[in-house]
Amino acid sequence: MPAYLKDELSGFIPEEISSEIIKDVARGSSIIRLSKAEEMKTDEKKVPVMTSGAGAYWVGEGERIKTSGASWIYPKLKAKKLGVIIPVTKEKLNDTTIDVFSELRESIAEAFYKTIDAACIFGTSSPFETSLFGKIKTAGNVIPATGKIDIDVSDAMSKVEENGFDVNGFTATIGLKGTLRKLRDNNGASLFIEGTNQKEFYSQPIEFVRNGAWNKEKATIIGGEWKYSLFGLKQGIEFEILKEATLQNTLDSDGNPISLAEQDMIAIKATMRVAYLCVKENAFAAVVPADYDKDVTLSALTIGSLNLSPAFDKDTTEYTATTTAATNTITATATDSGATVEIKNGSTTVTSGSAATWSSGENTVTVKVTNGSKSKTYTVTVTKS
């Protein structure tokens, strides 16, 4: 007899659907498709990695074979919980559990693989200690773009090869495909092969991140020896039915967070546990924008003596403040002295260190930091009472 969702408000998604979701996640995630898979039975797993190999010796007749030691390290894969919440109509409670998750399978998988790629490749909203690109930067294996992508990628491959590794795959932004299609070798043959099941560049597989997770400001393409990129998965996807929550990060058509009780809805929370670790940063290299290292953050932002909410942090771009004064002095300082700062109160330009005049109600202050071709905008909504 089929189980109905109303009778199973929490537990594991049925195995036949869970396994299909995991397959969909693997198909949609570039980092999973390229990395070495590690099955995890617990939340932590030690992975033996050889740092120097054992040696072999020529042995004469009657001679004893020498022994040599190999050096090992044991980095840990640590599984972290990844969750997605999908609001649905309350009528879904009357459907079978299998039918509900069959219908939501694609949405759940897409949310998972986009978040996985963003976290593992670039460290975006990541619970992991480091990311693939973070490791590449630490190793100094970055090639600033020159406008000749074939040469730039060759130079990145050389970085890896100089360290004793071999590039056996790439991952890149989907926007690079058009450029790669135009590349030819000396004989006029295409350097990029767009096959039905496998795409290749420099005769190595290339995976394009098409799920919105790629950060073009950080890198254009990453290549490496992918057995040193480890992805761990703890089997099983859990679910929980939410009935009373307000979904702060899910907005209705009116722009307000969805209140499940008020709107006669439920939400399905699905969670899985995954782990990521790059064990040898020198095995990877990236082609980066020419000005990738240009800093476009602020080191300080003050509006008189007003308290910004949240407290100022260079990586936070949205703030609010309240004032009873007619004017307040705005001061904004770029972290990089070579960057320019443009301040506007509405459409009125304000020089840093000068006063802004407030209208009653909300006033929008924007602070734009520009460094080379990169820019970042901070916004403060100042309410004058």
Report each predicted region and the residues it spans.
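Assembly/oligomerization interface modules of large self-assembling protein complexes
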Residues: 2-84, 283-284
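Short, Φ-rich (hydrophobic/aromatic) sequence segments
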Residues: 16-27, 100-104, 108-116, 156, ...
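Glycine-centered loop/turn motifs
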Residues: 61-64, 203, 217, 353-355, ...
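Beta-rich interaction/scaffold domains
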Residues: 293-385
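Alpha-helical scaffold segments that mediate packing/assembly in large oligomeric complexes
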Residues: 73-76, 84-162
